[in-house]
């Protein structure tokens, strides 16, 4: 079992129960899923770019990504409906906890000029979204084999009812928020 999951069950739950005055363990917010999304707009011209992005996402997450397609045609972007324009992975369970641990302890500190993550990126329901400009912050990516530096969106979906609960949950995991 992932060490972050053990930490959540052993320490974070009791800490959050005291902080918010919950009566039951089931009321405590928990991380439900983590979604990684990589938009590859240049895939319109070169399909190989999407394959490389999918390979990067597979290496990072340990799971085969779903190819996302354009929902509608946009002439300005030269996109037609149904064109493959990105890929995404939804992590749950054990893989989610392993990825979350690597994200907090290894990947985020490797971000260039890192001064902490914005605490304003909550959506109003306790879910946190962040953007990463380079996929090379993850140790699974071999720097020499990268054809192009790509960014990705990382969304951490929680069962928290408010942003304060979500922020407290992530802070319990030592999530590096900007002061």
Swiss-Prot record:
Keyword Ribosomal protein in record: yes
A GO term from the CC aspect: ribosome
InterPro entries per UniProt: Ribosomal_uL5 (IPR002132), Ribosomal_uL5_bac-type (IPR020930), Ribosomal_uL5_C (IPR031309), Ribosomal_uL5_CS (IPR020929), Ribosomal_uL5_dom_sf (IPR022803), Ribosomal_uL5_N (IPR031310)
GO function term, MF aspect, one: rRNA binding
Signal peptide: none
Keywords: Ribonucleoprotein, Ribosomal protein, RNA-binding, rRNA-binding, tRNA-binding
Superkingdom, taxonomy of origin: Bacteria
Biological process, per Gene Ontology: translation
NCBIfam families, sorted: PRK00010.1
Role, per record: This is one of the proteins that bind and probably mediate the attachment of the 5S RNA into the large ribosomal subunit, where it forms part of the central protuberance. In the 70S ribosome it contacts protein S13 of the 30S subunit (bridge B1b), connecting the 2 subunits; this bridge is implicated in subunit movement. Contacts the P site tRNA; the 5S rRNA and some of its associated proteins might help stabilize positioning of ribosome-bound tRNAs.
Assembly and oligomerization: Part of the 50S ribosomal subunit; part of the 5S rRNA/L5/L18/L25 subcomplex. Contacts the 5S rRNA and the P site tRNA. Forms a bridge to the 30S subunit in the 70S ribosome.
Cross-referenced HAMAP family: Ribosomal_uL5_B (MF_01333_B)
Annotated family: Belongs to the universal ribosomal protein uL5 family.
UniProt-recorded name of the protein: Large ribosomal subunit protein uL5
Species, as recorded: Sodalis glossinidius (strain morsitans)
């Amino acid at each position: 079992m992932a060490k972050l999951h053990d930490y959540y069950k052993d320490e974070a739950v009791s800490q959050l129960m005291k902080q918010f005055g919950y009566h039951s363990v089931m009321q405590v917010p928990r991380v439900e899923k983590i979604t990684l999304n990589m938009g590859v707009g240049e895939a319109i011209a070169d399909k190989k770019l999407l394959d490389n992005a999918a390979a990067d996402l597979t290496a990072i997450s340990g799971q085969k990504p779903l190819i996302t397609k354009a929902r509608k045609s946009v002439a300005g972007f030269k996109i037609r409906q149904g064109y493959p324009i990105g890929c995404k992975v939804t992590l749950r369970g054990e893989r989610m906890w392993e990825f979350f641990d690597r994200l907090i302890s290894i990947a985020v500190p490797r971000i260039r000029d890192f001064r902490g993550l914005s605490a304003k990126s909550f959506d109003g329901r306790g879910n946190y979204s962040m953007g990463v400009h380079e996929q090379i912050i993850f140790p699974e990516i071999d720097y020499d084999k990268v054809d192009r530096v790509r960014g990705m969106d990382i969304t951490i979906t929680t069962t928290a009812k408010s942003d304060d609960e979500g922020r407290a949950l992530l802070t319990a995991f030592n999530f590096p928020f900007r002061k």
